[in-house]
From Swiss-Prot:
<comment type="subunit">
    <text>Heterotrimer of UreA (gamma), UreB (beta) and UreC (alpha) subunits. Three heterotrimers associate to form the active enzyme.</text>
</comment>
<keyword id="KW-0963">Cytoplasm</keyword>
<dbReference type="InterPro" id="IPR050112">
    <property type="entry name" value="Urease_alpha_subunit"/>
</dbReference>
<feature type="binding site">
    <location>
        <position position="361"/>
    </location>
    <ligand>
        <name>Ni(2+) 1</name>
    </ligand>
</feature>
<feature type="active site" description="Proton donor">
    <location>
        <position position="321"/>
    </location>
</feature>
<feature type="binding site" description="via carbamate group">
    <location>
        <position position="218"/>
    </location>
    <ligand>
        <name>Ni(2+) 2</name>
    </ligand>
</feature>
<dbReference type="Pfam" id="PF00449">
    <property type="entry name" value="Urease_alpha"/>
</dbReference>
<comment type="pathway">
    <text>Nitrogen metabolism; urea degradation; CO(2) and NH(3) from urea (urease route): step 1/1.</text>
</comment>
<feature type="binding site">
    <location>
        <position position="273"/>
    </location>
    <ligand>
        <name>Ni(2+) 2</name>
    </ligand>
</feature>
<dbReference type="InterPro" id="IPR017951">
    <property type="entry name" value="Urease_asu_c"/>
</dbReference>
<keyword id="KW-0378">Hydrolase</keyword>
<comment type="similarity">
    <text>Belongs to the metallo-dependent hydrolases superfamily. Urease alpha subunit family.</text>
</comment>
<dbReference type="GO" id="GO:0009039">
    <property type="term" value="F:urease activity"/>
</dbReference>
<dbReference type="InterPro" id="IPR005848">
    <property type="entry name" value="Urease_asu"/>
</dbReference>
<dbReference type="InterPro" id="IPR006680">
    <property type="entry name" value="Amidohydro-rel"/>
</dbReference>
<keyword id="KW-0479">Metal-binding</keyword>
<dbReference type="InterPro" id="IPR017950">
    <property type="entry name" value="Urease_AS"/>
</dbReference>
Amino acid sequence: MTLRLSRRAYAEMFGPTTGDRIRLADTELLIEVERDHTLYGEEVKFGGGKVIRDGMGQSQLPAADVADTVITNAVILDHWGIVKADIAIKHGRIAAIGKAGNPDIQPGVTIAIGAATEIIAGEGLIVTAGGIDTHIHFISPQQIDEALASGVTTMIGGGTGPATGTNATTCTPGPWHMERMLQAADGWPINLGFLGKGNASRPQPLVEQIEAGAIGLKLHEDWGTTPAAIDNCLTVADDTDTQVAIHTDTLNEAGFVEATVAAFKGRTIHTYHTEGAGGGHAPDILKVCGEANVLPSSTNPTRPYTINTLDEHLDMLMVCHHLDPSIAEDLAFAESRIRRETIAAEDILHDLGALSMLSSDSQAMGRVGEVIIRTWQTAHKMKVQRGALTGDGARNDNFRAKRYVAKYTINPALTHGIAHEVGSIEPGKWADLVLWEPAFFGVKPAMIVKGGMIAVAQMGDPNASIPTPQPVHYREMFATRGGALARTSLTFVSQLALDAGISARYGLAKRLVPVRGCRTVTKRDMIHNAWQPAIRVDPETYDVVADGALLTCEPAAVLPMAQRYFLF
């Protein structure tokens, strides 16, 4: 006997299925489920009178043969697709994406449930990979709480606290600071990787930072990003398989953008602030988007272009870069970096996939908890202003959604050599997962899973008789406590440092994972974000032309994912 359910009834019971569409928060973005891995009539669901019970959806298999945790009937949104599936977690890693249940009595089971299996109900929820923010100024450790609660599970950058150098640059300079920061990383339930200071014209000061545990090096104009420093830094990176991030020369003191590109010599580099106002060669840093060896990112303060963007930026810039508004040269420096035309073009370059990544620039002009929000606000603004992307139709925005989710998940992972561990929802990867109610997508996660264990969740009054009574807010869960913390989060280091035995020497508790493949990744590898246009920026008007087309758009006066979500 079969029972026919309406699509609405089915979605309310088991979540959306193939052909169903989901609105992302209060945006104009719609995603459509492309495939359902579960079988109609054989879905598993936990609860009184439901399927996952002994002898029904739960098998007699031992712990070795079943998942540790199954997220049931979830909609996965990732760069590779938008599908409905059960997600299996085993030993802190994603074990399978498919159909869960009892293989003794159910057909098509690819994930066995047993007495050793915990269940997280994913019905009606969207699951994304944990976000990766690659532009972190480690000014205050409390940033980590904000980032984790927003859905970011990996932070890469540099710093030592609220030192003047860290306020402006993402560098953890020298072996002593590197050791201290790696020791501090043991206390936080998030994946961390640190960049050393790359501004030197001889190799030894850079190599010793890589040996001390840096996953890469950061070149910043405030420390002197000259062609000689760039060349030396990239040479060391090539020798150690680490990445270089660069904030280029806003004042064009040591050369124009062409001189910087020439110093790259075709070698892979992650260009921070490839944007309209964040810094770097004024006014034409955007030109590097067209280089095959350049992996470009921008930061969230200009995302997206709104009627308030310009006014906000001047004061931010003066504080972050230790400038004095009473000094004419400092004021001119600040004003040269804030250009409405290039900010507007930045929106479009993100939408067309020329800008491959988006990050925060935390407490140094950017907001650490708003990477994900501002990514999707940009996607919404571009859909409203520019319409559907090629590859999307009238029914959904699937391609645009895949393009934008890749900007803060898989592409940063590929860039910094950590994609073998994080950055996507794929079997074998570390189980860093973010669960969202669709109405709150991109704004307020329902739950953050770190290394297979719940780290942060919206939780009600701990003294209540059930979990839901007010006040409901984000609270740290058991993955953030005791020895579980070190077993559910990773610290990324160089292979050189791992071989040197820094784990034992520094007394580290977290698992150290070496970065790899940093020197072979190119713009072509940036998933859904690999466009290499020929860009020209008019030095007088700042108009941006890409492959012959003028890139311009109006500032937004109203945005979704904003005030209505933050009344309390």
